Swiss-Prot record:
Compartments, record wording: Secreted
Residues spanning the signal sequence: none
Modified residues (Leucine amide): 14
Function recorded in the entry: Antibacterial peptide active against X.axonopodis pv. glycines (MIC=42 uM). Not active against E.coli ATCC 25922, S.aureus ATCC 29313 or P.aeruginosa ATCC 27853.
Family: Belongs to the frog skin active peptide (FSAP) family. Hyposin subfamily.
Taxonomic lineage of the native organism: Eukaryota, Metazoa, Chordata, Craniata, Vertebrata
A Gene Ontology term for the protein's cellular component: extracellular region
Keywords associated with the record: Amidation, Antibiotic, Antimicrobial, Secreted
Protein name: Hyposin-H6
Gene Ontology biological process: defense response to Gram-negative bacterium; killing of cells of another organism
Length: 14
């Protein structure tokens, strides 16, 4: 997983 994807997941609150 790329950091950018993890950031998006955290932003969505998933």
């Amino acid at each position: 997983l790329r950091p950018a994807i993890l950031v998006r997941v955290k932003g969505k609150g998933l």
